[in-house]
């Protein structure tokens, strides 16, 4: 991922990560009713059918299998949510650590720009620097972060090739 993209998507990713975290914390999974409904035959049978026993093979199969399938579906869905959360968290953590490595004052300025709560004029007044200096600081941060992303990518490639 590129630094410029992270600058644009940072707040959206933070919101998505918080949403996924909440989903994971309050995970209840599929209900038994939803699982049984998904396992039942939803289409209409073709032609006339005569049933000679009290319970169809499908009904017995559903009764015997639904708990195992429900547990598997819930585990798969939880894993999907967790993997998505972990991927976003990894990107945000890398990005934020890169910003922090700029130094305290520069990092504070960049985080103010990312938060979007203040205008550039308000940030420049708060830190006693010009808008031009803010623009330069943003560009320098993006250049630095792009180098970090390139280094991470090289290390991942090196690992995969070893």
Predicted regions and their residues:
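N-terminal interaction/assembly modules
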Residues: 1-98, 150-162
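Short alpha-helical segments used as structural interaction elements across diverse proteins
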Residues: 11, 64, 103, 128, ...
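N-terminal positioning helix adjacent to the helix-turn-helix/winged-helix DNA-binding module
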Residues: 91, 102-106, 137
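Mid-sequence acidic-hydrophobic segments that form the walls
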Residues: 98, 116, 144, 148
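Short amphipathic alpha helix immediately N-terminal
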Residues: 101-118
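Short alpha-helical "recognition helix" segments of helix-turn-helix
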Residues: 122-127
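DNA-recognition helix of helix-turn-helix
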Residues: 128-148
